[in-house]
Amino acid sequence: MTDKIKITEHNGGKHIAIAGDINSILVSKNDTGGTYSIVEIKVFPNGGPVPHIQTREHEGFYVLEGELLFTVDGTEIIAKSGTFVNIPPHVTHSFTNKTNQLAKVLVVLAPAGLENLFIEVGDEVSDPTIQPPSMSADKMKKFADVAA
């Protein structure tokens, strides 16, 4: 366990382009001794990951801005700003921004470590406000396969 305080300023953290979105790693497993990590995802219109499963992480999604369509075990949930969606391990899920506005979601991952997959599969970017290109089908499949 770490005993260091970490402060991440606005638009701070490591920014990773993945699945056509920007994942900003605010707190990583190195900061929390592996207990949890926190990632802010900027989900651009029509963005979001393919359906996937995590086998070890609990994921908590808190919608900060905009609206996302979550599909959780085949059930669709429209999550607007202020909505929290908790997804335990072994549950197929995805989310998509079906609007024409940027959506932002804060994601708590426990235990930590999934953020390393984002770094492995995605591309680091310096400006978290610019929409990245869509991810290739090969990279998207690798993301879904490795995330499990």
Residue ranges and their predicted role:
Residues M1-T35, I130-A148:
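A short, N-terminal "cap"/entry segment at the start of jelly-roll beta-barrel domains
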Residues T8-E9, G74-T92:
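Short acidic-glycine-tyrosine-enriched beta hairpin
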Residues N23-S28, V39-Q54:
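Conserved short histidine dyad/triad with adjacent acidic residue
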Residues I25, I38-E40, G60, E76, ...:
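Conserved hydrophobic/aromatic beta-strand scaffold that supports enzyme active sites
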Residues T32, P89-E115:
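Ligand-binding loop in jelly-roll beta-barrel domains
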Residues R56-L68, D73, G82:
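Glycine- and acidic-residue-biased ligand/ion/polar-headgroup-sensing regions
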Residues K104, N116-I130:
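A hydrophobic, small-residue-rich beta->alpha segment in the mid-to-C-terminal subdomain
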